[in-house]
Amino acid sequence: MKIVNIIGGLGNQMFQYAFAVALKKENPDEMVYIDTHHFNYLFVKKYKTSNLHNGYELEKLFSNIDIEKAPISMLMKVTNYIPNFFLSRVARKVLPKRHTEYVAKLSESQTYIPGILSLAGNVYYEGYWQAAQYYINCREKLCYAFAHPKPNEYNAKLIKEITNSSSVGIHVRRGNYLLSPTYSGICNLEYYKKAIVRIKSDGKQHRFYIFSNDINWCRQNIVPLLGDSEVLFVTENTGVNSCWDMFLMSYCRDLIMANSSFSWWGAFLNNNAERVIAPYPWMNGRDTSGIYAPEWIKIDC
């Protein structure tokens, strides 16, 4: 039996679910579950704006999620179960780790760990599992699992435009990233300049779609880099609808990523992309070489 902990925002939940899918592919005769219990208790609502974001979102968005949630009886067999994410983190520092638990270090998040999918016996997996190599062989299954719901009129129109043009998605994430020692300073203006030059080197007339939580900054700083190219700002997908920026990115012919899980999934789920450009490194002070799919173009930052 294998159980994968689900926690964090939508992008991280997708990585963790994808890891469960990869486990099932590697261990077809074993039971594989996901653990979503940390989202079920009122205590987490107080902390919703930190790392729990909009709560458990996978089944709200995706109708093809088919890995079952672990019942408490199963959890008790493999982990020191406490039905609260924050209290369980405290307990992990006090109680010894059980032999059935594999708790990945943060430094391992973007690193492929050989043999991790084939550990013998009952295992409870806790981590972020953001290495692309885990998912290359189950990409078709993940595209099916993460097929988006029916779009509203605004996004349906954009999907049609994006698929019928020489579209380039540019994702710019600012906000809390500006103060983060882990993420700040990587996707700077020089990165976007290099990426845009790379895209425009083919001589085509591109239409650029800008996805960002700071549109005003993009108007002042990104638009001047685009010359006379057509530019459209995607502005209506906010709050619980912000996931639609990720879905729209998955239709773009070319994509300039930010160092964001939304960018990652927009690129990975994209069946139309001719070029995907990604920043390197992905994070400051950490080996993130495993997060990149082999075909992505890395630009040094």
What are the language-model segments listed below?
Residues V44-F62, C218-G227, S289-A293:
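Short, aromatic/basic amphipathic alpha-helical patches
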